[in-house]
């Protein structure tokens, strides 16, 4: 059952009773269906496993006696005796009866010659079509197999297919109908020719009943082929037409199709497709170019079918052209085209299956943009199509679309109109309601089989069951309400008791239907409800119906009218009276008339009693309720009794809602328009101030009178919905009511709004409808009153911009890097450790709003300084990983790829990543002395910044798509400082600052998208390693120059000293040197021994030495040597 609208949009207690009465009692049956009778559906069942219902057709024979048939194909039905096969398939004919198992098998295709053919799995009944009332019937077996040289070495088997054409009484008359049709027999064999043509996959008749059309999608390597032949023996055109051979391919967009296109999988024809009153043929090729195509063809004088237009599908593997139908949906004289694509899917919008409606523009198809109808996921929506004829007799054809895997299966009914197809289905038939699964796999309509002048619908399935849905006649009811008196004067009681005021209400009904001969007795039940709007506000009604029925409420009166035939006008009347002491004398009394068709109780009917007549139904497109208002006589309008009010909208501006009683005006743009930021605000306020003051204080009587029934009407855009009303003072707030979808608001400002009154209030508007495409909020405001005043609408606008709540930050680890070692060329690099110090950058993007995939394509970009200005390496990128930007537990792929030199990754890092361990700080490597030997003073050193923004470095941009993330995404970048570049270029630099920049960019079609704080700068300081400043490896020529320079300096110094006389020796007079001889002194006679004995040590006084002459030398103990005697012993010496 279709969903019924909820009744809680106002949230007041008095709503539910009336709406539940109206909807449940009157509108509920009409909301669930229109004029196809579901309760009286006729089921037919076949043999289990026979695929009874794979194809269906409505048929009506006129001779020898009129009878309607439900033709059902069962391509897996068991074989007949003599067919020498297990399953051959068959065609079944079912009468219109309540019996479910009274179908019989049409007597065709008996016997078999196994030397020439095989009927095993020939799938007879795969397609079945009828010409209509009194016409022929065609059914096919597309897997029929022709054999030659059976049981021989050169035996051949060709799956050519075949069809049978039956007379209107389902008998085969070869002399009239041709009987068995095998177009591919006797033609060249092989799958590249006609050996697998599968004639009869689709078969149909032209609408003028002259031509029979067969589809053979297996011909020419499954390119496909169409055969068209005339079955009208009186027609002089008895040629057989077929589509072009592969060798006859035409040029241009309307050329022939490629192989494996399956041309002829679906076929139809119609007049007015290309030229008025000219017959064209249409064929589907669901595998053409992997998207599918539909070809419109014409026949020429050379028995060929020439393609004129090719319509291509929009999605790969959508099966565009799997089914098709031709009809004039808008009745403009030009045939329109409906194409099914059951394999179409849209993952984001959760759509599955599609039907494309091409509205013919006078035979021009090039610039037509088709309307696309879609089903639910995996429903196979569009696998079957049927033209129903004018189902509701409104002058426009209707169509049916099958979706066999939408639940138990559904069939969607779409009405035609002057503008084309109505996109909202008028009725949805569900397989669950009739107990059939895979309901809607095949469809047939457009023929009235029960004789009520309304076309019916036959629905097949894959569950060996079919069901007939008969159309119910549609009644168009006219109703009128007469009120007396039209205005209520509370000062003039007119009831019989003379105390109260009474109002007479008269209602009249009549109906018309199609055809004019259809005139059943129609019984209508109606209900008059008094003071409807007041009760919707939760207030007690002011009226009662004295003559109400026993089951009626006091404010309601019900009745029944019986219309005997079309145009019969029958009336009913009643009286309501106003209650005593009515206080609300300003608001009008609303009387609502609701009516419905009285449906007789369904009685169970025996199967042999024939079909019961289907009951009529009211037109679902015609409202079954009517309102009328009864006003009070107005008072207080001055001496002239003419109310000339002066309602003015003094203030109208958008405000942000801070609390329930606090509002703040939105900021203004340069042009004075309010600015609204879409950043999670669920509501927005609209401040309104309405005054009723005299326009000229000097002439206060000229205007400014009471404004009776003063109202403010607000029309909201689709992005805003009414939520409530607030006031800041203690005065009574206006009563505001909205329509069902809260897009139109009516606020009562007073009845009357007194002279000198000023009302300020806030409309609370929900912003849930604001989307990313919304650029402006525009509310149309109109003051209304029944007093004399000329009022014009006023517009309030606000610009909408979307501020992305994104923040980005970054950090480098470590934040200081050092360089040292030896200079290595790029070709010498083998591992990442050869490059230099490792650094890791971590960039975090936080998202506090909705997922980015709803706004556009977002990218996280990092500007990586990979080279200095002269092209030498700076930071070598090793690895880039994005976490969180692709969804939970997914890693994104950034471009371009890092590590373009394909250096080996440090095995320790690879092991940690495989184990998922955190990355530790890299241990310091063994410091190698720098190869630089020339010392640089600290005063000469300088600070350098390497930044791509300043032109001191060259950057490569790594771009990482952020498809969706809820809270945060983290980008990890690992790199290596190129040690050699710094040794060669920056030895004289005190420090270097390497700048890495990151930002977020959004590619979106949204013009009002604002992105702030979307960039960050990550610096890293680089220094020369102080431990490594040691000179080594001095070149030999430097050593040679240093030696030579030293020798030269030494020579100059010696020459200078020689010139100054430094090398001249001083001359002294010749002196007598005393001679000493060694003597032996006994130990006990030595002075030292004596001193040691006595304990007194006397040291020599080296300062009082004795000199002999002026040139004498002091006598030192160190100069003394003992003189040896003849025996070798020291001798004593006397001075």
Curated annotation (Swiss-Prot):
Q: Report the glycosylation sites.
A: 86, 741, 943, 979, 999
Q: Report the transmembrane regions from the record.
A: 1037-1057
For this entry, list what GO says about its biological process. blood vessel morphogenesis; cell adhesion; cell adhesion mediated by integrin; cell migration; cell-cell adhesion; endodermal cell differentiation; heterotypic cell-cell adhesion; integrin-mediated signaling pathway
Extracellular side of membrane: 34-1036
In Swiss-Prot or TrEMBL terms, this protein is called Integrin alpha-7
FG-GAP repeats: which residues? 38-103, 110-165, 185-238, 248-305, 306-367, 368-423, 427-486
> Where in the cell is the protein located?
Membrane
Principal place where this protein is found?
Answer: membrane
Q: Which organism is it from?
A: Rattus norvegicus (Rat)
Is Signal set as a keyword in this record?
yes
Q: Where is this site: Cleavage?
A: 603-604
Q: In which tissues is it expressed?
A: Expressed in skeletal and cardiac muscle. Expressed in replicating myoblasts. In differentiated muscle fibers localizes between fibers and the surrounding matrix. Isoform Alpha-7X1A and isoform Alpha-7X1B are expressed at myotendinous and neuromuscular junctions; isoform Alpha-7X1C is expressed at neuromuscular junctions and at extrasynaptic sites.
- Record keywords: ADP-ribosylation, Calcium, Cell adhesion, Cell shape, Cleavage on pair of basic residues, Disulfide bond, Glycoprotein, Integrin, Membrane, Metal-binding, Receptor, Repeat, Signal, Transmembrane, Transmembrane helix
Q: Which residues bind Ca(2+) 1?
A: 328, 330, 332, 336
Q: Which residues bind Ca(2+) 3?
A: 448, 450, 452, 454, 456
């Amino acid at each position: 059952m279709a969903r019924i609208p909820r009744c809680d949009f106002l949230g007041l207690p008095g709503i539910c009773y009336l709406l539940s009465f109206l909807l449940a009692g009157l509108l509920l049956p009409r909301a669930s269906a229109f004029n196809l009778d579901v309760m009286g559906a006729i089921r037919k069942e076949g043999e289990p496993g026979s695929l009874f219902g794979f194809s269906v057709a409505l048929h009506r024979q006129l001779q020898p006696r009129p009878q309607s048939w439900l033709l059902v194909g069962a391509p897996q039905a068991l074989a007949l005796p003599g067919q020498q096969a297990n399953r051959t398939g068959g065609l079944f004919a079912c009468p219109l009866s309540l019996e479910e198992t009274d179908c019989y098998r049409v007597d065709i295709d008996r016997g078999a010659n196994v030397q020439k053919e095989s009927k095993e799995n020939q799938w007879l009944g795969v397609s079945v079509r009828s010409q209509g009332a009194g016409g022929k019937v065609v059914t096919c077996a597309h897997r029929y197999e022709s054999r030659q040289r059976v049981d021989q070495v050169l035996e051949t088997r060709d799956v050519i297919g075949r069809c049978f054409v039956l007379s209107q009484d389902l008998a085969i008359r070869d002399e009239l109908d041709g009987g068995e049709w095998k177009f591919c027999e006797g033609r060249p064999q092989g799958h590249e020719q006609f050996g697998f043509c599968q004639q009869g996959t689709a078969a149909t008749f032209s609408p003028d009943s002259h031509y029979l059309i067969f589809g053979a999608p297996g011909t020419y390597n499954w390119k496909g082929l169409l055969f068209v032949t005339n079955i009208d023996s009186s027609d002089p055109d008895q040629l057989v037409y077929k589509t072009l051979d592969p060798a006859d391919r035409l040029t241009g967009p309307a050329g022939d199709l490629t192989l494996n296109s399956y041309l002829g999988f679906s076929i139809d024809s119609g007049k007015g497709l290309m030229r008025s009153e000219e017959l064209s043929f249409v064929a589907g090729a669901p595998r053409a170019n992997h998207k599918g195509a539909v070809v419109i063809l014409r026949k020429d004088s050379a028995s060929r079918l020439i393609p004129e237009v090719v319509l291509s599908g929009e999605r790969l593997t959508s099966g565009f052209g799997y089914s098709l139908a031709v009809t004039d949906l808008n009745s403009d004289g030009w045939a329109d085209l409906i194409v099914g694509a059951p394999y179409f899917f849209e993952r984001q919008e959760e759509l599955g299956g599609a039907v494309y409606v091409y509205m013919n523009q006078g035979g021009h198809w090039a610039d037509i943009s088709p309307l696309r109808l879609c089903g639910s996921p995996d429903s196979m929506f569009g696998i079957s199509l049927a033209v129903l004829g004018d189902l509701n007799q409104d002058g426009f054809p209707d169509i049916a679309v099958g979706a066999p895997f939408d639940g138990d299966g559904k069939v969607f009914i779409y009405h035609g109109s002057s503008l084309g197809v109505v996109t909202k289905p008028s009725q949805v038939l569900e397989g669950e309601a009739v107990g059939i699964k895979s309901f809607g796999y095949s469809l047939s309509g457009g023929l009235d089989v029960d004789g009520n002048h309304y076309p019916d619908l036959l629905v097949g399935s894959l569950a060996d069951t079919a069901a007939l849905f008969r159309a119910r006649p549609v009644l168009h009811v006219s109703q009128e309400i007469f009120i007396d008196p039209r205005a209520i004067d509370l000062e003039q009681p007119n009831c019989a008791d003379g105390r109260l005021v009474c109002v007479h209400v008269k209602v009249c009904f009549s109906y018309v239907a199609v055809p004019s001969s259809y005139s059943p007795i129609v019984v209508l039940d109606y209900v008059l409800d008094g003071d409807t709007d007041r009760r919707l506000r939760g207030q007690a009604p002011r009226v009662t119906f004295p003559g109400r029925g026993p089951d009626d409420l006091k404010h309601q009166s019900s009745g029944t009218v019986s219309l005997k035939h079309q145009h019969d006008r029958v009336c009913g009347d009643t009286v309501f009276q106003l209650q005593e002491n009515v206080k609300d004398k300003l608001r009008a009394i609303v009387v609502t008339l609701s009516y419905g068709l009285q449906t007789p109780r369904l009685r169970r009917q025996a199967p042999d009693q024939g079909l019961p007549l289907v009951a009529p139904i009211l037109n679902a497109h015609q409202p079954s309720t009517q309102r009328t208002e009864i006003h009070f006589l107005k008072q207080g309008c001055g001496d002239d009794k003419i109310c000339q009010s002066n309602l003015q909208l003094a203030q109208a501006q958008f405000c942000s809602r801070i609390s329930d009683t606090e509002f703040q005006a939105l900021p203004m743009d340069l042009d004075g328009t309010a600015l609204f930021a879409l950043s999670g605000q669920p509501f927005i306020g609209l401040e309104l101030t309405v005054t009723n003051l005299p326009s000229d204080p000097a002439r206060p009587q000229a205007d400014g009178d009471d404004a009776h029934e003063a109202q403010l009407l607000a029309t909201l855009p689709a992005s805003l919905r009414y939520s409530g009303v607030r006031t800041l003072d203690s005065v009574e707030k206006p009563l505001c009511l909205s329509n069902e979808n809260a897009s139109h608001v009516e606020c009562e400002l007073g009845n009357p709004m007194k002279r000198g009154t000023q009302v300020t209030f806030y409309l609370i508007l929900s912003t849930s409808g604001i989307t990313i495409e919304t650029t402006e909020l525009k509310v149309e405001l109109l003051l209304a009153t029944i007093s004399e005043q000329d009022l014009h609408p006023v517009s309030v606008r606000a610009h909408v911009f979307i501020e992305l709540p994104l923040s980005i930050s970054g950090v480098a680890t470590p934040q200081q890097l050092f360089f040292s070692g030896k200079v290595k060329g790029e070709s010498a690099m083998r591992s990442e450790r050869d490059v230099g110090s490792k650094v890791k950058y971590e960039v975090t993007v936080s998202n506090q709003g909705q997922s980015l995939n709803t706004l556009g394509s977002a990218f996280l970009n990092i500007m990586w300084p990979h080279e200095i200005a002269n092209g030498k390496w700076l930071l070598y990128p090793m690895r880039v990983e994005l976490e969180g930007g692709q969804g939970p537990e997914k890693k994104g792929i950034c471009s371009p790829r890092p590590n373009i030199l394909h250096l080996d990754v440090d095995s320790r890092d690879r092991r940690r990543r495989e184990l998922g361990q955190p990355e530790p700080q890299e241990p310091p490597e063994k410091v190698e002395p720098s190869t630089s030997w020339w010392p640089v003073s600290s005063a000469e050193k300088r600070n350098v910044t390497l930044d791509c923004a300043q032109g001191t470095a060259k950057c490569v941009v790594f771009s990482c798509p952020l498809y969706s993330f809820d809270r945060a995404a983290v980008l990890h970048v690992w790199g290596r400082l190129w040690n050699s570049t710094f040794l060669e270029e920056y030895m004289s630099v005190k420090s270097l600052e390497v700048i890495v920049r990151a930002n977020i960019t959004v590619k979106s079609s949204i013009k009002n998208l604002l992105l702030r704080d979307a960039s960050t700068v990550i610096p890293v300081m680089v220094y020369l390693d102080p431990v490594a400043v040691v000179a080594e490896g001095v070149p030999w020529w430097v050593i040679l120059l240093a030696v030579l320079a030293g020798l030269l300096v030494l020579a100059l110094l010696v020459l200078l000293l020689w010139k100054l006389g430094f090398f001249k020796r001083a001359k002294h007079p010749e002196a007598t040197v005393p001679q000493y001889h060694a003597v032996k002194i006994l130990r006990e006679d030595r002075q030292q021994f004596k001193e040691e004995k006595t304990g007194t040590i006397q040291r020599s006084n080296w300062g009082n030495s004795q000199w002999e002459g002026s040139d004498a030398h002091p006598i030192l103990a160190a100069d003394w040597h003992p003189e040896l005697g003849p025996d070798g012993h020291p001798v004593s010496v006397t001075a």
